[in-house]
């Protein structure tokens, strides 16, 4: 599978997951709206709030993953794929093989 195909597959998978997670989160919020329970005094309330927060966290990570893969596809189209966004040097092929959506070379990634 080519890098482009791999990135396109990652964008598609993340988009599907994002849609599913959004639906789950919306359903959870809607269900809690129908319930008049007070989370603070309901023994299940903190669990529901925790689950909602966990789901929102996974949704945000999925959005970032999709965005990173789309950014890499845009770089491919622009002819700048594989160039570190911080220092401008080439990103090692091994790093791109491990993380096709890498924006930074190893040295810049280590520096944070």
Role assignments for model-derived ranges:
Residues 99-111:
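Cysteine-rich micro-motifs
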Residues 93-97:
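Short, non-ligating residues that shape and space the ligands of small metal-coordination modules
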Residues 82-85, 103:
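Cys/His-enriched microdomains
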Residues 77-80, 101:
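Short metal-coordination and nucleic-acid-contact micro-motifs, chiefly zinc-binding Cys/His arrays
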Residues 64, 87-88:
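Short amphipathic alpha-helical surface micro-motifs
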Residues 86-87, 107:
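Short, cysteine/histidine-rich loop/knuckle motifs that typically chelate Zn2+
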Residues 91-92, 110:
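Short functional micro-motifs and their immediate structural scaffolds
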Residues 1-78:
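Interaction interfaces in information-processing and related assembly proteins
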């Amino acid at each position: 599978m080519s890098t482009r195909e791999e990135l396109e597959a990652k964008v598609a998978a993340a988009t599907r997951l994002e849609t599913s997670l959004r639906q789950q989160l919306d359903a959870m919020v809607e269900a809690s709206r129908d319930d008049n329970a007070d989370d603070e005094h309901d023994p299940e309330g903190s669990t529901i709030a925790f689950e909602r927060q966990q789901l929102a966290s996974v949704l945000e990570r999925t959005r970032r993953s999709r965005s990173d893969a789309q950014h890499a596809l845009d770089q491919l189209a622009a002819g700048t794929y594989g160039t570190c966004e911080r220092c401008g040097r080439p990103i090692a092929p091994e790093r791109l093989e491990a993380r096709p959506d890498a924006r930074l070379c190893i040295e810049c990634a280590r520096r944070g």
